[in-house]
């Protein structure tokens, strides 16, 4: 019985929510291991939509859900999201939700700094959600973060806040912002402490005990591997590691506990925010994909950029995340196109390459090299077996497998969880 890591294989928004929900019904424990409340997803269960951005998807199914130490937690958003779920009839208690005691907190100063940087008229715009994710990770690495466990120790909380503000107030002075008083941050923290502390735990211990007891653990990744701080399109990336290896570091469970890595892969490509996008389509096909695929961000509402499937970046992610198989999503969006293109390589300064360069300049200069396949006029929407798929659709899927070097384990043909074709069970050893 394998544990499963779910990772986005592109730039996020691949449809992880539906796949995670499908898998979470069979899992015993669901773990968030990186990111914050900057990447959202929607679950549709019995006609009811649940929009989550911080809490693990397993909560809506009553499964033990864990926020690992690799996540940055906005305590006020945490409380709001818990209350929203309760308002939809979901029972959220410490019996089903645990938060790592060593998870860093996002504070108001992080959100303000994030917004100020992104709104600046000078410098490089990354396209953040302005929710304080990046600045919170900066403080974690700088060893000045306030962590969840600090809320239990008033005697050490004040000096930690003082140290934090010594850094932030120097930044604020340089940006022409008013300095923040220690009491302001202390009040911000103490006002919410009683609502988050009942959920804290030694998550590494809880997960290890569950693993030894034979529980099936599902690691729920946020965003996509091409937004990874090391392996993504730097600097147009997020502030955490999003590749599958982070599941171990961000949960406290050793890497040998990771069994199967499932890469969620959209049948075309999208990206939100700034950064290179070799196969982007600024034409009627791009508009078609965006409109039919409802390509708008769950958290920000921002319109996503759309383009053809890029086998180069997915093949690279298969390697950097150790992907065993992919879940191919939104196949139905391609229905009706006369022809479909797949990027199989890039041209860089007159040379053919089979990888995405690390250099920002080179990433901007690469040109896609396409193969063109015939499309299909039949519908794939709602298909639940290979026999339901048009012959040309099957050829498209098989060609993707060949190009990326990984098999398709699951196929999604609509937002409904039942419209899923299972090829390989990720939980099966």
From Swiss-Prot:
PANTHER family: ADENYLOSUCCINATE SYNTHETASE. The active site is at residues 13, 41. HAMAP family: Adenylosucc_synth. Keywords: Cytoplasm, GTP-binding, Ligase, Magnesium, Metal-binding, Nucleotide-binding, Purine biosynthesis. Its main location: cytoplasm. GTP binds at residues 12-18, 40-42, 304, 330-332, 412-414. Pfam families: Adenylsucc_synt (PF00709). NCBIfam families: PRK01117.1 (NF002223), purA (TIGR00184). This is Adenylosuccinate synthetase. One of its GO terms (biological process) is 'de novo' AMP biosynthetic process. IMP binds at residues 13-16, 38-41, 129, 143, 223, 238, 302. Substrate binds at residues 298-304. The keyword Plastid does not apply. InterPro entries: Adenylosuccin_syn_GTP-bd, Adenylosuccin_syn_Lys_AS, Adenylosuccinate_synth_dom1, Adenylosuccinate_synth_dom2, Adenylosuccinate_synth_dom3, Adenylosuccinate_synthetase, P-loop_NTPase. It comes from Brucella suis (strain ATCC 23445 / NCTC 10510). It catalyses: IMP + L-aspartate + GTP = N(6)-(1,2-dicarboxyethyl)-AMP + GDP + phosphate + 2 H(+).
């Amino acid at each position: 019985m394998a544990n499963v890591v779910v990772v986005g294989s592109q730039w996020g928004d691949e449809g992880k929510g539906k796949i995670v929900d499908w898998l979470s019904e069979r899992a015993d424990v669901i773990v968030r291991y990186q990111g914050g409340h900057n990447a959202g997803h929607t679950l549709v269960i019995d006609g009811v939509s649940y929009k989550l951005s911080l809490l693990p998807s397993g909560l809506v199914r009553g499964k033990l859900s864990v926020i690992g130490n690799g996540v940055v937690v906005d305590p006020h958003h945490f409380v709001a999201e818990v209350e929203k779920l309760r308002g939809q009839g979901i029972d959220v208690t410490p019996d089903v939700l645990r938060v790592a005691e060593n998870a860093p907190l996002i504070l108001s100063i992080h959100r303000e700094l994030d917004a100020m940087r992104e709104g600046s008229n000078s410098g490089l715009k990354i396209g953040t959600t302005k929710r304080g994710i990046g600045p919170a990770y900066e403080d974690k690495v700088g060893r000045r973060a306030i962590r969840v466990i600090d809320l239990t120790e008033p005697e050490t909380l004040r000096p930690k806040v003082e140290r934090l503000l010594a850094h932030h107030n120097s930044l604020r002075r340089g940006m022409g912002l008013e300095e923040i008083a220690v009491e302001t941050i202390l009040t911000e923290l103490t006002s919410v402490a009683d609502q988050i502390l009942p959920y804290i735990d030694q998550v590494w211990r809880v997960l290890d005990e569950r693993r030894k007891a034979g529980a099936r653990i599902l690691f729920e990744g946020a965003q996509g591997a091409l937004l990874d701080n090391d392996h993504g399109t730097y600097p147009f990336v997020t502030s955490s590691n999003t590749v599958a290896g982070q599941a171990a570091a961000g949960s406290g469970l050793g890497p040998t506990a990771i069994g199967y890595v499932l890469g969620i892969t959209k049948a075309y490509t999208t990206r939100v925010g700034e950064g290179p996008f070799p196969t982007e389509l600024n034409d009627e096909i791009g508009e078609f994909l965006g409109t039919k695929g409802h390509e708008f961000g769950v958290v920000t509402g921002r319109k996503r950029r759309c383009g053809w499937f890029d086998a180069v970046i997915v093949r690279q992610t298969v390697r950097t995340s150790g992907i065993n198989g992919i879940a191919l999503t939104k196949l139905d969006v391609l229905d009706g196109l006369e022809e479909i293109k797949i990027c199989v390589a890039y041209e860089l300064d007159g040379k053919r390459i089979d990888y995405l360069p690390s250099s920002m300049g080179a990433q901007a200069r690469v040109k896609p090299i396409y193969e063109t396949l015939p499309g299909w006029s039949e519908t794939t929407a709602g298909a639940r077996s290979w026999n339901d798929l048009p012959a040309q659709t099957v050829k498209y899927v098989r060609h993707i497998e060949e190009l990326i070097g990984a098999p398709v384990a699951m196929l999604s043909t609509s937002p409904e969880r039942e419209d899923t074709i299972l090829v390989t069970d990720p939980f099966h050893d």
